[in-house]
């Protein structure tokens, strides 16, 4: 059994594609009657989600209901857009971990993050000091501040770290830093 959260940083009017592998976790959660949720990386974004449970008695009725749950969930996730330019990926990642903990039923917990990792706001707002610091040092400092959620027992998958959309370009040095930083943050508290 699996429960999951999808975190996306898609902004208003931006088109993006959610990786198929990312959608396998919410599909499994919905089919198993577990929690599936999503949120955007806006500052103070509210998680959306629920535990999906069928109400029909027949196998055919349950399958139809699950298909409807899947369609509704995927439409919501693919349509989710950040409402402000205040993207804070770390805050959203922490919120997702806390949301899964609040719905913990003993199943495997998975967070799928679809983001470049760039955050113009929050504790990881891109500054030259941050981008030049060691990922482990950043993780240790944030953990000592209590700025990281408990990721123990939570599997986190990142999609698109260091990749820009449209005509934006992220320099290789920054892309490499982002690709190492976020997994290190998760590992710092047991993920």
For each feature predicted by the language model, list its residue ranges.
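VWA/integrin I-like adhesion module and closely mimicked acidic/polar interface patches used
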Residues: 118-179
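Sec-exported extracytoplasmic/periplasmic mature domains
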Residues: 24-31, 75, 95-105, 119, ...
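A short amphipathic beta-strand at an alpha->beta junction
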Residues: 35-39, 153-156, 190-191
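Second-shell loop/turn segments in exported
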Residues: 6-14, 56, 73-87, 165-176
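Extracytoplasmic/secreted envelope proteins and their assembly/folding machinery
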Residues: 19-23, 90-97, 139-142, 179, ...
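Von Willebrand factor
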Residues: 1-114
């Amino acid at each position: 059994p699996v429960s999951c959260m999808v975190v996306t940083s898609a902004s208003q009017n931006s088109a993006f594609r959610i990786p198929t592998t990312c959608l396998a976790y919410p599909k499994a959660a919905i089919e198993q009657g577990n929690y599936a949720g999503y949120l955007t990386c806006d500052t103070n974004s509210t998680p959306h989600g629920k535990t999906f449970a069928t109400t029909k008695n027949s196998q055919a009725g349950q399958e139809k209901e699950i298909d409807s749950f899947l369609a509704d969930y995927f439409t919501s996730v693919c349509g989710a857009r950040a409402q402000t330019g205040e993207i804070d990926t770390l805050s959203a990642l922490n919120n997702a971990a806390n949301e899964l903990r609040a719905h913990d039923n003993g199943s495997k917990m998975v967070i799928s993050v679809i983001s470049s990792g760039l955050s113009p706001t929050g504790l990881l707002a891109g500054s030259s000091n941050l981008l030049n610091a060691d990922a482990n040092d950043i993780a240790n400092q944030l953990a000592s501040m209590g700025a990281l959620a408990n990721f123990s027992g939570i599997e986190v998958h990142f999609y698109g770290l260091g990749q820009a959309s449209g005509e934006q370009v992220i320099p290789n040095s920054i892309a490499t830093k982002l690709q190492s930083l976020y997994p290190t943050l998760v590992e710092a508290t047991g993920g």
